C-alpha cells in the first residue's frame, strides 16, 4: 500500500467533495467505515477509489475513513431564498461577498446545542463511559499500570474538554441561512426584513450558491433537521445542522464554515453575484417607486438580473 503524500490542493479537495459518494472507477458506493483513497491516476487525473481499485492510483494523497455526512445535501436545482432589507442587499452587491454570522450571535439560544439541560446527565454519563472504554482499549495501553483513580481522572478530563468545546464551536462556526421553497413566503417577508416595505428577496438555487461561493471546500451546504430535543440529542459533530421542531416552518438550508481564532460576530465570504442571484423580488408591501429604486441600484452596479415586484400582488376574483 502506497504511503500518503498528504499533498492537498484546493482542486483535489473540490473533486473529493463532488465525487466522494462512490468509487470513480467501478462505481461502488462507499458505506460507513469503508476506506476511500483520494489521489492521482498515472495520467494525473483525480480519482476517489475503493480498496479493490486503489492499486490504480499513481499517487495517494490521503485515505479517508468514510462516513456519511451529518447533513443532507439539497439537490442542485432546489430553489433557495434570502430575505433582507435594501441596505443589506446593497452591501452584498457592492462588496461582492456574503455575510456569515457567528452561531453565538443568533437569537435562537439552541444554535449548536447538543440537547436540553434536563438531559445533560444522560449525555455526560454516555461519554464518560465512552472515554473510559477508549482509554482501556487504546493501542499500547498497559492496563496493569492504570489505576482506577487515573482512569476516572483522565475520562473526566476528556469529558470536560468535550463540554468546553461546545461554546468554543459556537464562536468559531459561521452560518449563512437560506429558505428552501419553490414560492415566496409571506412569513419570511415579515420575519426576516426589518421593514417589510423596504425589503427584497434574492432567489437562487443550491447549485448556484455552491458555484457562487467558488466551490469552496471548507463551506458545507446542507438542510437543517428539526428534532424534538426532549426525545433525542442532536449530534456530537453536527449540532449546527439541528434545530427545534418549532422552527420547522423555516425549511432552512444553511452554508457553514468553521473559522478558529476569529473573534468576530460575523465574517464576509467572497461571492460571485452574477452566479448567485437568479432573480430579485421586491416586497409585496413595497410601493411602486421602491421597485424603481431597486432597479436603479441594480443598474448602477451593472448587474444583469431581473427585478420583479412580488408575485403575491396578484389580484383575486370572487
Each predicted region: which residue ranges?
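Short recognition patches in nucleic-acid-associated and regulatory proteins
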Residues: 17-44
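Generic recognition of cysteine residues
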Residues: 23-26, 35, 50-53, 177, ...
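Cysteine-rich micro-motifs
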Residues: 43-56
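Generic marker of residues within folded, mature protein domains
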Residues: 13-16, 39-43, 192, 245, ...
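Short Cys/His-rich Zn2+-coordinating modules
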Residues: 2-15, 31-37, 239
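Partner-binding and oligomerization surfaces adjacent to conserved cores of proteins
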Residues: 58-318
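Non-catalytic N-terminal targeting/anchoring module and adjacent flexible stem/linker
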Residues: 1, 12, 22-26
Amino acid at each position: 500500500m502506497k504511503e500518503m503524500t498528504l499533498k492537498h490542493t484546493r482542486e483535489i479537495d473540490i473533486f473529493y467533495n463532488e465525487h466522494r459518494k462512490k468509487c470513480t472507477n467501478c462505481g461502488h458506493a462507499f458505506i460507513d467505515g469503508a476506506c476511500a483513497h483520494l489521489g492521482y491516476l498515472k495520467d494525473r487525473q483525480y480519482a476517489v477509489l475503493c480498496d479493490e481499485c486503489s492499486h490504480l492510483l499513481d499517487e495517494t494523497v490521503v485515505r479517508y475513513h468514510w462516513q456519511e455526512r451529518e447533513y443532507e445535501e439539497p439537490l442542485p436545482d432546489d430553489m433557495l431564498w434570502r430575505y433582507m432589507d435594501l441596505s443589506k442587499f446593497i452591501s452584498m452587491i457592492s462588496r461582492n461577498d456574503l455575510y456569515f454570522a457567528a452561531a453565538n450571535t443568533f437569537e435562537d439560544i439552541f444554535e449548536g446545542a447538543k440537547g436540553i439541560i434536563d438531559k445533560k446527565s444522560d449525555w455526560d454519563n454516555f461519554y464518560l463511559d465512552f472515554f473510559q472504554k477508549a482509554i482501556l482499549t487504546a493501542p499500547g495501553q498497559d492496563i496493569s499500570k492504570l489505576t482506577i483513580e487515573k482512569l476516572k481522572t483522565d475520562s473526566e478530563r476528556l469529558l470536560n474538554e468535550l463540554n468546553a468545546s461546545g461554546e468554543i464551536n459556537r464562536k468559531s462556526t459561521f452560518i449563512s441561512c437560506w429558505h428552501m421553497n419553490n414560492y415566496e413566503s409571506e412569513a419570511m417577508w415579515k420575519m426576516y426584513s426589518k421593514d417589510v416595505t423596504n425589503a427584497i428577496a434574492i432567489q437562487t438555487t443550491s447549485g448556484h450558491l455552491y458555484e457562487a461561493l467558488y466551490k469552496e471546500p471548507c463551506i458545507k451546504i446542507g438542510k437543517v433537521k428539526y428534532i424534538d430535543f426532549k426525545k433525542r440529542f442532536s449530534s456530537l459533530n453536527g449540532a449546527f445542522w439541528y434545530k427545534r421542531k418549532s422552527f420547522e416552518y423555516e425549511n432552512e438550508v444553511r452554508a457553514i464554515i468553521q473559522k478558529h481564532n476569529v473573534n468576530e460576530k460575523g465574517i464576509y465570504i467572497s461571492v460571485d453575484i452574477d452566479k448567485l442571484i437568479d432573480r430579485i423580488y421586491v416586497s409585496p408591501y413595497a410601493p411602486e417607486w421602491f421597485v424603481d429604486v431597486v432597479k436603479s441600484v441594480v443598474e448602477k452596479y451593472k448587474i444583469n438580473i431581473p427585478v420583479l415586484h412580488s408575485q403575491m400582488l396578484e389580484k383575486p376574483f370572487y
